[in-house]
């Protein structure tokens, strides 16, 4: 009788715990998440696959908040309408822009609007202001959006009539703690590489094989301390002689933007992981440290001299990079593209590759000397702009790029690529351009497919080790990946001048039965194979209370005896708690 009472008591405890778990789960259903929440589009508005709900707490934005509106990269253009503006040499002031609620397949975001003629919208500068719904201290709005990266901020109006744009207090851009620079806007990613807009499939953060990003300082040409952003690829400590990409921001920008709003680190992460790019370091410049507008010739000469005489020596002294100019690239957007053209003009010997994005060039027949032409014939040049980029359709760009530089490069047989991206003078264009530059232009190095010389497509049992021999030089080995997951270096051995990898049985036992994909990553290539794990035949049939369970000979875990009320109560508690946890 006493055992029955104990059993009933334990069941009661289980029931109480289950109810409490249920109450906790239900209480969270109605919780409001500040920041952004991304789900499938159920608004019935637009053809976008996703919807994003923005929620901000006005008490975190100061006192006497009168109203909050959303602004950011939520203006779109129809791709079918872009050619007219290009062909007619029109300013993008005349282009029709569409809101997020009007999105259709084939549209793409273009940063800010070129005009504010549509009176159904409110604007702050060139950005549509999306009204938010107030509920006590919370403001919210939901936008249907296609898959890409977006920047945004909140336009806050106060009771005294003043207004300011602020970042999301729960999702600010990452700050450089050395000088307090940040990317000015909050940002987020929608969707994934499989459904991203054209040119954006490499921008998404990885969940493995990721590089790191940090900030450093150097002494500039004028004796002052200036900041650099430094991206280091995954496995940096294992390699040497890394190639280097120097990136310049646009007018008013700084060293934080390229790897946040521009996703440059993510793009390189993905390209390296997929064998599309040799291991490379990125150095993001802070050209706003120097005086000048960014379009002034004297200022750009200073920038060029500073990167050659100060930045490159600092990087080569403190980081494991190649000192060969053919392993360096310089690219920039907008004003940074102007800087890139100046670097190409006065320091062509210092780089092997130049990227001029959304920028006119300060170059003419007087500058394009026979000496410069001779030096550029061993370089690669990439030029790009957006479909409705004022850097493409304004008269300055047309005269300097379309009418002068491209014909000149053709005439002198200089290797160049000119590409138009979907977008305006904005990050959608610049991310797409950088992806092409890194993936298709850089390094003149095709990805090397190394061979598995022994151990390819092998069948092994769970209790066995796996030995793989390759033709990869040991000095080039970087990492081992199984099923898209990097394997901890301490869990396998690497030996030989041409590497042999041994996966011990302890590692094999952690993998599931069936086929697996193994990839050995080298500095400039990879080797890959499949292997198959079959079940260990050394198993026991264990009979306990008329129940048969199959267990390894090394371990045998039995279910509790069901005729023991005490153990049954504990078992019931375990099952119910497991179910509650799932709820």
How would you label these PLM feature ranges?
Residues 23-31, 446-459, 480, 525-578:
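Intrinsically disordered, low-complexity repeat and linker tracts
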Residues 45, 53-147, 157-190:
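Aromatic-rich carbohydrate-binding modules that target alpha-glucans
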Residues 61-62, 133, 182-237:
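N-terminal cap/lid segment of alpha/beta-hydrolase-fold proteins
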Residues 144-148, 505-514:
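Surface-exposed, short loops/turns at beta-strand junctions within beta-sandwich domains
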Residues 229, 240-252:
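Short beta-strand element of the alpha/beta-hydrolase
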Residues 251-318:
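Cap/lid segment of the alpha/beta-hydrolase catalytic domain
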Residues 317, 324-375:
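Primarily recognizes the serine-hydrolase "nucleophile elbow" in alpha/beta-hydrolase
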Residues 384, 389-448:
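C-terminal catalytic histidine-bearing segment of alpha/beta-hydrolase fold enzymes
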């Amino acid at each position: 009788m006493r055992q029955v009472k104990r059993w009933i008591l334990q069941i009661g405890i289980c029931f109480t715990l289950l109810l409490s778990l249920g109450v906790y789960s239900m209480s969270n259903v109605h919780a409001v998440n500040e920041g952004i929440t991304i789900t499938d589009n159920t608004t019935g508005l637009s053809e976008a696959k996703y919807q994003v709900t923005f929620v901000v707490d006005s008490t975190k934005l100061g006192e006497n908040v009168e109203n909050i509106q959303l602004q950011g990269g939520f203006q779109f253009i129809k791709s079918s309408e872009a050619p007219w503006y290009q062909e007619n040499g029109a300013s993008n002031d005349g282009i029709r822009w569409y809101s997020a609620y009007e999105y259709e397949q084939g549209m793409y975001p273009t940063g800010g609007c070129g005009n504010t003629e549509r009176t159904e919208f409110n604007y702050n500068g060139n950005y549509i202001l999306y009204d938010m719904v107030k509920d006590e201290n919370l403001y919210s709005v939901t936008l249907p959006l296609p898959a890409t990266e977006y920047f945004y901020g909140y336009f806050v109006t106060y009771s005294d009539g003043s207004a300011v744009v602020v970042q999301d207090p729960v999702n600010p851009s990452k700050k450089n703690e050395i000088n307090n620079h940040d990317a000015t806007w909050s940002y987020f990613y929608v969707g994934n590489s499989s459904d991203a807009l054209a040119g954006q499939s490499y921008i998404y953060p990885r969940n493995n094989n990721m590089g790191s990003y940090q900030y450093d300082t150097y002494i500039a040409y004028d004796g002052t301390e200036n900041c650099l952003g430094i991206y280091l690829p995954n496995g940096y400590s294992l390699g040497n002689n890394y190639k280097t990409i120097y990136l310049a921001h646009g007018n008013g920008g700084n060293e934080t933007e390229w790897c946040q709003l521009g996703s440059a680190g993510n793009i390189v992460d993905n390209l390296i992981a997929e064998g599309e790019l040799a291991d490379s370091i990125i150095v993001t410049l802070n050209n706003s440290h120097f005086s000048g507008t960014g379009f002034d010739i004297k200022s750009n000469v200073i920038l060029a001299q500073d990167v050659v005489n100060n930045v490159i020596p600092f990087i080569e002294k403190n980081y494991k990079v190649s000192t060969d100019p053919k392993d360096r690239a310089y690219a920039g957007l907008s004003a940074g593209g102007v800087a890139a053209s100046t670097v190409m003009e006065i320091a062509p010997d210092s780089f092997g590759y130049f990227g001029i994005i959304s920028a006119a060039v300060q170059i003419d027949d007087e500058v394009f000397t026979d000496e410069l032409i001779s030096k550029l014939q061993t370089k690669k040049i990439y030029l790009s702009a957006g479909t409705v980029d004022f850097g493409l359709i304004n008269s300055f760009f047309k005269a300097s790029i379309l009418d002068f530089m491209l014909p000149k490069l053709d005439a002198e047989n200089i290797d160049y690529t000119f590409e138009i991206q979907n977008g305006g003078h904005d990050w959608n264009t610049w991310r797409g351009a950088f992806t092409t530059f890194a993936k298709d232009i850089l390094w003149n190095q095709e990805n090397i497919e190394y061979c598995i010389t022994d151990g390819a497509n092998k069948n092994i049992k769970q209790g066995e080790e796996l030995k793989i021999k390759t033709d990869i030089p040991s000095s080039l080995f970087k990492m081992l990946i199984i099923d898209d997951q990097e394997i901890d270096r301490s869990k396998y051995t690497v030996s030989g001048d041409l590497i042999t990898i041994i996966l011990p049985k302890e590692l094999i036992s952690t993998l599931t039965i069936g086929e697996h994909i193994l990839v050995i990553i080298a500095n400039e290539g990879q080797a890959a194979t499949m292997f198959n794990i079959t079940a260990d035949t050394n198993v026991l049939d264990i009979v306990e209370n008329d129940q048969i369970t199959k267990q390894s000979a090394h371990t045998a875990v039995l279910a509790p005896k069901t005729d023991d009320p005490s153990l049954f109560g504990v078992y019931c508690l375990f099952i119910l708690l497991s179910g509650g946890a799932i709820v």
